[in-house]
């Protein structure tokens, strides 16, 4: 059966839910898609709540691990929504997911207020390029005292302010559970709050200006085989646009390969061309599943090159921000998280600098054990033992 064609009729915006484990991010995602389905049934498919937490181990533990993409539409826009994991071990996946957001809904339970992972996500958001955050104050049906809700709201606004976000952003008092379940008390009231939240998202999160004129680049997030057709790589197009049957290079980690892609899909719909901001699958001609991996990029030929040695400008997180408790020295070997993958690298501090303390802004040289498609200005996270300990950008490519 021929697949539906993807139509670009409305502005497309990538948003997502971030926040602490069990504060209701996935429930809110389900509530948004249900409320919008009920309001605009022609525009929005019905999603099963359990589909969002897709992997079996997640349902056993009740924790969202990988990233779930769903799509929905308001009257004004088409959205791709990423439900980001909230569990501390999975911040790595949050980084890959959050790098795909034009704005985020921070979900905070009114019963708890901001918790450790709320803080970590807000801290990471600017590093992974999330420009705007608004707030869903969830579980308001479980708090009788209006003053307590106001206190939590104030605390959330302070947290946003401390991390460079707008403290006067929209904050919606809601209950995702109440809006999702028809038999919940005050169901209609909570549905109205979800509509209010989406009106705020429409207004507050700006339509992104995608870099269509720059050379095409898509970081590879996943690779799989479609039997009889070939290898598909998926990811979000970072910049540029690409018509079908165009030559591309696969750059990074391994020697650069040239190939052509013969099909483009987004949300299971066929496209003739993909462009910046699209979540896309590309079918590559003559490439085996084992020839490509997450962490490489698909790029316009000659537009980006692989490098292992660079100078970086880095902010080192303090202990309170979840970073290291002690300084590090030359020959420190953490992981450097570029786009969608971790690569180990060796740090060399500049002459005259003996060590770098938590809380410092530092410049140092890094030599990676594998080449990464790199340009000046590329951002990265520094990670150790599963925790983010710093964030930085490439200031100068050395080799």
Swiss-Prot record:
Top-level taxon of the source organism: Bacteria
Ranges where the record places region G3: 83-86
UniProt xrefs under Gene3D superfamilies: P-loop containing nucleotide triphosphate hydrolases, Translation factors
UniProt-annotated binding residues for Mg(2+): 26
Matching CDD domains: EF_Tu, EFTU_II, EFTU_III
Enzyme Commission number, as recorded: 3.6.5.3
Gene Ontology CC terms, in alphabetical order: cytosol
Pfam families reported in the protein's UniProt record: GTP_EFTU, GTP_EFTU_D2, GTP_EFTU_D3
Enzyme class, UniProt record, top EC level: hydrolase
Keywords: Cytoplasm, Elongation factor, GTP-binding, Hydrolase, Magnesium, Metal-binding, Nucleotide-binding, Protein biosynthesis
Molecular function GO terms recorded: GTP binding; GTPase activity; translation elongation factor activity
Location of the region described as G5 in the Swiss-Prot/TrEMBL record: 175-177
Region feature (G2): 62-66
Residue ranges of the region described as G4: 138-141
Catalytic activity: GTP + H2O = GDP + phosphate + H(+)
Subcellular localization: Cytoplasm
Residue span, tr-type G domain: 10-209
NCBIfam families xref list: EF-Tu, PRK00049.1, PRK12735.1, PRK12736.1, small_GTP
Assembly behavior: Monomer.
Name of the protein in question: Elongation factor Tu
């Amino acid at each position: 059966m021929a697949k539906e064609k993807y139509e670009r009729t409305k502005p497309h915006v990538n948003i997502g839910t971030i926040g602490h484990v069990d504060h209701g991010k996935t429930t809110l995602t389900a509530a948004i898609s249900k409320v919008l389905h009920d309001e605009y049934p022609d525009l929005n498919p019905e999603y099963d709540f359990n589909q969002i937490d897709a992997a079996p181990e997640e349902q056993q533990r009740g924790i969202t691990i990988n990233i779930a993409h769903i799509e929905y539409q308001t009257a004004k826009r088409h959205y791709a929504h990423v439900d980001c994991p909230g569990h501390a071990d999975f911040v790595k996946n949050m980084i890959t997911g959050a790098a795909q957001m034009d704005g985020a809904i921070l979900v905070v339970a009114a019963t708890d207020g901001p918790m450790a992972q709320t803080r970590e996500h807000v801290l990471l958001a600017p590093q992974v390029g999330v420009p705007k955050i608004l707030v869903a104050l969830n579980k308001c049906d479980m708090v009788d005292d209006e003053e307590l809700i106001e206190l939590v709201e104030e605390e959330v606004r302070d947290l946003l302010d401390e991390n460079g976000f707008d403290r006067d952003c929209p904050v919606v008092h809601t209950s995702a559970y109440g809006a999702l379940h028809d038999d919940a008390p005050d169901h209609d009231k909570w549905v109205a709050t979800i509509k209010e939240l989406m009106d705020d998202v429409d207004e507050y999160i700006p339509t992104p200006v995608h870099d269509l004129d720059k050379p095409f680049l898509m970081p590879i997030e996943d690779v799989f085989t479609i039997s009889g057709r070939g290898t598909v790589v998926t990811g979000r197009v970072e910049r540029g646009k690409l018509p079908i049957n165009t030559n591309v290079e696969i750059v990074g980690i391994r020697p650069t390969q040239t190939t052509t892609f013969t099909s483009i899909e987004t949300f299971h719909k066929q496209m003739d061309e993909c462009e910046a901001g699209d979540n896309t699958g590309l079918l590559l001609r003559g490439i085996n599943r084992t020839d490509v991996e997450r962490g490489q990029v698909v790029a316009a030929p000659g537009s980006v090159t692989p490098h292992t040695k660079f100078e970086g400008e880095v902010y080192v997180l303090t202990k309170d921000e979840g970073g290291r408790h002690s300084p590090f020295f030359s020959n420190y070997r953490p992981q450097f998280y570029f786009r969608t993958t971790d690569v180990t690298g060796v740090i060399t501090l500049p002459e005259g600098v003996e060590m770098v303390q938590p809380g410092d802004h530092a410049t140092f040289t890094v030599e990676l054990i594998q080449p990464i498609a790199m340009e000046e200005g590329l951002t990265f996270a520094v990670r150790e033992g599963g925790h983010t300990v710093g964030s930085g950008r490439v200031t100068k490519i050395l080799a």
